[in-house]
Curated annotation (Swiss-Prot):
Tree of life domain: Bacteria
Claim: Oxidoreductase is one of the keywords in the record: yes
Catalytic activity: N-succinyl-L-glutamate 5-semialdehyde + NAD(+) + H2O = N-succinyl-L-glutamate + NADH + 2 H(+)
UniProt entry keywords in alphabetical sequence: Arginine metabolism, NAD, Oxidoreductase
Residues annotated as the enzyme's active site: 244, 278
Xref: NCBIfam families: arg_catab_astD (TIGR03240), PRK09457.1 (NF006992)
Protein's UniProt name: N-succinylglutamate 5-semialdehyde dehydrogenase
PANTHER family with a match to the protein in the record: ALDEHYDE DEHYDROGENASE-RELATED
Species of provenance: Pseudomonas putida (strain GB-1)
Example GO BP: arginine catabolic process to succinate
Gene: astD
Length: 487
């Protein structure tokens, strides 16, 4: 089986056997063997050898390859969406939007590169001051499973655009999406060695992160893994590390006029992608009193009607599955743990079929829980916390080690401005779902959600480093010599 793409060639793995499964049917989608350390090293060396020629290409030449990649994605959009749905359980309508995001990433990255890391110059005395940017060299990209096409693409595209070469290790749960993506790069004419693919689980990731031949690592995934990488890179300021991690995101609800609009926005924030977006609302802060009671009652009633089903089911469901049976069981266990601590199940999250990773939306009131776990429960489980006043709501919203996303539903601009100033998050939304983000904006958080290397529109910043130069075409003595020097 040809599993890994190294130096322009597909080759079989020499490590443990890997399988990706359809989360609903448990059918095998992809199978192969992981990369061992020697294969990881070969991928890094291939990238190192390809780097000088790729970096020396003109920016326009690299853009041409990237645009051909986008064109290939358009040609294979249906197959890519099918693969994303099959491997992640995401409904086809949502998988199709992910492919569209992959395509659009190319033009957005080019615009960002020109604005943030292009070339700038100006006169300075008898010289010209020039600012240019250089690629780091060889960078590793670790991809997640929830957006197996779009999120790795958000690192790979700007990295290649800047002139870097890449070794890509996707999630072991979504290897087929990665394989299809790499095939699109090959069809686009990307030179051998510029992008290398190594499939594998933890052992492959450890080998790649520890390889001395990489100049940087771009990671999207859990805070636990991100923290381990941060510790591993401690004392290595020469290597660039960009961490995009999760959040225990709060959504604060004020007493708004349009109750159903609030309910719909909450659902889009908490349960889209079966709650498997890093920006999903995990904590819903609702005012005490009759208005808050009415909101929660309406939310529960509507959530009972949310359709859950297989990725290709017709009519299309709103929610697909979570990524695996293991993930589904962990979420059911988390709900039970919250209930044991005093949480009240307002709408119990259930797993209708023991052999399918389909979960129904869950809502649990944890107001009375004294020691609420500050964890990211990555699925359709929403915790409700009732608050006495707006300041208490903001304090509770900030009561987390994370700082990725926060939102407010309110009819008052003054309240939003007050909330915005006091909230601690990299994404702060007003009357919009937490899971909505502008492609023309940076994406990242503070605290345990990242290391101040915002991605998306700001990915260009960590894909190249600035080089400042003073330049003049001819060497000449200045009109006035420095005191104490005689020529």
């Amino acid at each position: 089986m040809t599993t890994h793409y190294i130096a322009g060639n597909w080759q079989a793995g020499q490590g443990e056997t890997l399988q990706s499964l359809n989360p609903v049917t448990q059918a095998v989608v992809w199978q192969g063997q992981g990369a061992v350390a020697s294969q990881v090293d070969a991928a890094v060396q291939a990238a190192r050898q390809a780097f000088p020629a790729w970096a020396q290409l003109s920016l326009e030449a690299r853009i041409d390859v990237l645009e051909k990649f986008a064109a290939q994605l358009k040609v294979h959009a249906e197959a890519m969406a099918q693969c994303i749905g099959e491997e992640t359980g995401k409904p086809l309508w949502e998988s199709a939007t992910e492919v569209t995001s992959m395509i659009n990433k190319v033009a957005i990255s080019v615009q960002s590169y020109r604005e943030r890391t292009g070339e700038k110059s100006g006169p300075l005395a008898d010289a010209t001051a020039v600012l240019r940017h250089k690629p780091h060299g060889v960078v590793a990209v670790f991809g997640p499973y929830n957006f197996p096409g779009h999120l790795p693409n958000g690192h790979i595209v700007p990295a290649l655009l800047a002139g870097n070469c890449v070794v890509f290790k996707p999630s072991e749960l979504t290897p087929k999406v990665a394989e299809l993506t790499v095939n699109c790069w090959i069809a686009a004419g990307l030179p051998a060695g510029v992008l290398n693919l190594v499939q594998g689980a933890r052992e492959t990731g450890v080998a790649l992160a520890a390889n001395p031949g990489i100049d940087g690592l771009f990671f999207t995934g859990s805070s636990r893994t991100g923290n381990l990488l941060h510790q591993q890179f401690a004392g290595r300021p020469d290597k660039i590390l960009a961490l995009e991690m999760g959040g225990n995101n709060p959504l604060v609800v004020d007493e708004v006029k349009d109750l159903d609009a609030a309910v719909y926005t909450i659902i889009q924030s908490a349960f889209i992608s079966a709650g498997q977006r890093c920006t999903c609302a995990r904590r819903l802060l609702v005012p005490q009193g009759s208005w808050g009671d009415a909101l929660i009652a309406r939310l529960v009633d509507v959530c009972k009607t949310i359709t859950v089903g297989a990725f290709d089911e017709q009519p299309a469901p709103f929610m697909g599955s979570v990524i695996s049976l293991q993930a589904a069981r962990a979420l059911i266990a988390a709900q039970a743990e919250l209930a044991a601590k005093g949480g009240v199940k307002l709408l119990e999250m259930t797993q209708p079929q023991a052999d399918a990773a389909l979960l129904t939306p869950g809502i649990i009131d944890v107001t009375a829980v004294d020691e609420r776990p500050d964890e990211e429960f990555f699925g359709p489980l929403l915790q409700v916390i009732r608050y006495v006043d707006f300041d208490a709501a903001i304090d509770e919203a900030n009561n987390t080690q994370y700082g990725l996303a926060a939102g407010l539903l309110s009819d008052s601009r003054a309240r939003y401005q007050y909330f915005w100033l006091r909230s601690r998050a990299g994404i702060v939304n007003w009357n919009k779902q937490l899971t909505g983000a502008a492609s023309s904006a940076p994406f990242g958080g503070v605290g345990a959600s990242g290391n101040h290397r915002a991605s998306a529109y700001y990915a260009a910043d960590y894909c190249a480093y600035p080089v400042a130069s003073l330049e003049t075409a001819s060497l000449a003595l200045p009109a006035t010599l420095t005191p104490g020097v005689t020529l």
